[in-house]
């Protein structure tokens, strides 16, 4: 749920982008590049990773006018399940992040020593005028410093440009990469909004990137949570958990505690977001009898671990 972003977007010290940035955590993005480039290297591997990073950064920079109609149609065909829209349709980060394109070019220049005409046996089929980017290996600490400076500059310029102090990012997979994000952005803090696993599964099954089958969506959810919970202690005081149900039951106390965690002053405007429809317990009406029995059995241990009631217990905040 992005309810916390809606809450804290009302704070005068907080800036919240209206979308996920995508270039940070998606395949071929900054974290993917960071975790792979220094662990294994060959000229071909390096070129492939550079090309993927460059393609992703270009795709999210700005949408061309010619793409808007087909993208609009694709997104309305089963919400993109029938026909996938163009990659990153609608993303135009250059409109929001100051000098985004210039910083991207500067980053790529720092990574690539030179380019030359050439092709690998595995170069994409029928590439016109193929080119190879030669990117020499970098020590992990050198790569970390380079990428950290890139991200820090991007985000600090955004905050200066908008006259805010704190940037609130709502990234779907951020909690899976807390350690890596902390290495590149050591001042970052992470908030994990917990929710009844069965309600999360009900929500997941309606997303175009998740299985529609709710039992499959349960396995999807459990793998995510196992990884997140295994690493939550690594962040120490920079990681904070809060239940959606607790936020709804006592918003003032919950938001005050989050403000303290973020180093923000509490203001009354944060309570103006409507929290009356959290869809708590939605799984009871959306799951059929077989799904309820199967999924309750699958998430039994996770319910206990997270402190949520089992099938026949009532919810306690």
Regions found by a protein language model. Give the residues of each.
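Conserved nucleotide-sensing/catalytic segment adjacent to the nucleotide-binding pocket
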Residues: 35-65
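A glycine- and Lys/Arg-enriched "phosphate-lid" helix/loop adjacent to the NTP-binding pocket
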Residues: 191, 199-223
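PAPS/PAP-binding and catalytic site of the sulfotransferase fold
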Residues: 1-13, 180-185, 196, 241-266, ...
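Short His-Asn-centered micro-motif
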Residues: 19, 169-172, 244
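PAPS-dependent sulfotransferases, especially Golgi type II membrane carbohydrate sulfotransferases
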Residues: 71-72, 78-145, 205-208, 225-241, ...
């Amino acid at each position: 749920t992005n309810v916390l972003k809606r809450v804290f977007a009302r704070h005068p010290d907080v800036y919240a982008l209206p979308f996920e940035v995508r270039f940070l955590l998606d395949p071929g993005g900054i974290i993917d590049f960071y975790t792979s480039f220094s662990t294994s290297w060959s000229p071909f591997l390096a070129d492939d990773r550079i090309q993927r990073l460059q393609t992703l950064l270009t795709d999210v920079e700005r949408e061309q006018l010619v793409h808007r109609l087909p993208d609009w149609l694709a997104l309305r065909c089963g919400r993109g399940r029938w026909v996938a829209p163009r990659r990153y349709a609608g993303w135009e980060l250059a409109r929001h992040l100051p000098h985004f394109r210039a910083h991207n070019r500067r980053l790529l220049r720092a990574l690539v020593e030179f380019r030359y005409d050439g092709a690998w046996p595995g170069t994409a089929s029928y590439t016109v005028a193929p080119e190879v980017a030669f990117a020499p290996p970098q020590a992990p600490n050198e790569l970390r410093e380079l990428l950290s400076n890139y991200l820090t500059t991007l985000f600090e310029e955004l905050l200066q440009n908008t006259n805010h102090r704190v940037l609130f990012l709502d990234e779907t997979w951020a909690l899976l990469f807390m350690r890596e994000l902390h290495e590149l952005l050591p001042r970052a803090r992470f908030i994990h909004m917990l929710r009844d696993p069965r309600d999360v599964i009900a929500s997941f099954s309606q997303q175009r990137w998740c299985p529609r089958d709710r039992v499959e969506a349960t396995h999807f959810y459990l793998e995510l949570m196992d990884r997140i919970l295994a690493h939550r202690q690594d962040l120490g005081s920079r990681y904070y958990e809060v239940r959606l149900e607790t936020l709804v039951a006592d918003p003032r106390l919950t938001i005050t505690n989050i403000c303290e965690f973020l180093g923000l002053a509490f203001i009354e405007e944060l309570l103006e977001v409507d929290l009356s429809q959290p869809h708590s317990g939605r799984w009871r009406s959306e799951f059929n009898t077989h799904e309820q029995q199967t999924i309750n059995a699958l998430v039994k241990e996770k319910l206990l671990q997270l402190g949520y009631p089992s099938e026949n217990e009532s919810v306690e905040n």
